[in-house]
């Protein structure tokens, strides 16, 4: 069952977060740009309001939240009503797939990754951006998830855990990147993007279809 209720009811709150935390957003976007290809037939799974898709040049994707789809359409994007576990795309049809802060909301992460593997062309790229549950911000989200409109039903993952799932579902790992260091309310400038993981709270994994 898609976890869409919070996003349908609190669409403005979701979009406003990126305005309030503009340096965090820009840092995350810079990390994604290091991993995501600049051209090719790409989609975003969990495109939301298009906050990441638009600057990354992605024009379409799937999104189960009706209100989020409306926001994406207003930006000229083409969101399709769908979920990660059952993608409405042909086999071997996409050069790249993006998922940003979406993995914590899927019902079945293994099936989701298998579906992404199916729609990717040979050697296609799968780029994931997420908050590591073992990071400072991840631990804060976990500790306060019952109070959060968006995260109360979320399932968080650690980087090592995701790397193992990617390997099991037919992907090899090309690179990992990290950014967002420290507490959210203490970030007052765009932060560096470093290779690897273990220090930053926002992690980007660049994987490739085997």
Model-identified regions with their sequence ranges:
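C-terminal lobe and adjacent flexible extensions of AdoMet/dcAdoMet transferase-like proteins
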Residues: 201-210
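Class I SAM-dependent methyltransferase SAM/SAH-binding core
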Residues: 43-86
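A short glycine-rich, Lys/Arg-flanked "PGG" loop and its adjoining helix->strand segment in the class I
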Residues: 110-122
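Short catalytic micro-motifs in class I SAM-dependent methyltransferases
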Residues: 101-104
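A conserved beta-strand element that flanks and buttresses the S-adenosyl-L-methionine
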Residues: 98
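Conserved class I S-adenosyl-L-methionine
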Residues: 1-39, 51, 125-156, 180, 187-188, ...
């Amino acid at each position: 069952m898609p976890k869409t209720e919070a996003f349908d009811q609190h669409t403005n709150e979701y979009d406003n977060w990126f305005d309030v935390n503009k340096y965090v957003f820009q840092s995350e976007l810079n990390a994604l740009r290091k991993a995501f290809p600049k051209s090719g037939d790409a989609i975003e799974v969990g495109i939301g309001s298009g906050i990441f898709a638009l600057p990354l040049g992605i024009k379409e994707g799937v999104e189960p939240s009706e209100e989020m789809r409306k926001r994406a359409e207003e930006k000229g994007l083409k969101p399709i009503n769908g979920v990660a576990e059952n993608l409405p795309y042909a086999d071997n049809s996409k050069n790249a797939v993006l998922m940003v802060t979406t993995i914590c909301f899927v019902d079945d992460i293994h099936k989701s990754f298998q579906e992404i593997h199916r729609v990717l062309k040979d050697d296609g790229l799968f780029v994931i951006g997420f908050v590591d549950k073992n990071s400072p911000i991840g631990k804060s989200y976990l500790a306060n998830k019952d109070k959060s409109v968006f995260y109360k039903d979320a399932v968080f993952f650690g980087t090592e855990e995701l790397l193992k799932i990617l390997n099991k579902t037919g992907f090899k790992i090309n690179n990992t990147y990290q950014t967002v260091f420290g507490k959210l309310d203490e970030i007052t400038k765009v932060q560096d993007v470093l290779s690897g993981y273990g220090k930053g709270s926002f992690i980007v994994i660049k994987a490739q279809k085997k």
